[in-house]
């Protein structure tokens, strides 16, 4: 499978790459340079670049969005919400049926996430609260 990974140099990137690299063709993208030990295809790309994400996803079978930004309101919105829009737009434009978007599990259940003890299910109502990261990821999920 040909996979586009958005935001791939962050915390989850190395684990996802390790799990996929031997069986799939990966294009890693991020605004930061890849780790020195990464020997695959890399493109410098911001997840909120709608045209850039659409172009990078051409010919791909799957898009995985690992992007995250927490420290600035506008940038968090651009990355988590507009970035998700860019990903979904690219999937629709290029007829990509497999899309994975990562985000905090507590955007589903708010600050009471400890009470669920990891038992997340589709019937859980979203409760992102007012925390910047959870709220911006929740808005992205709504797209």
Question: Each predicted region: which residue ranges?
Answer:
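NAD(P)H-binding glycine-rich loop region in Rossmannoid oxidoreductase-like domains
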Residues: 34-35, 45-82
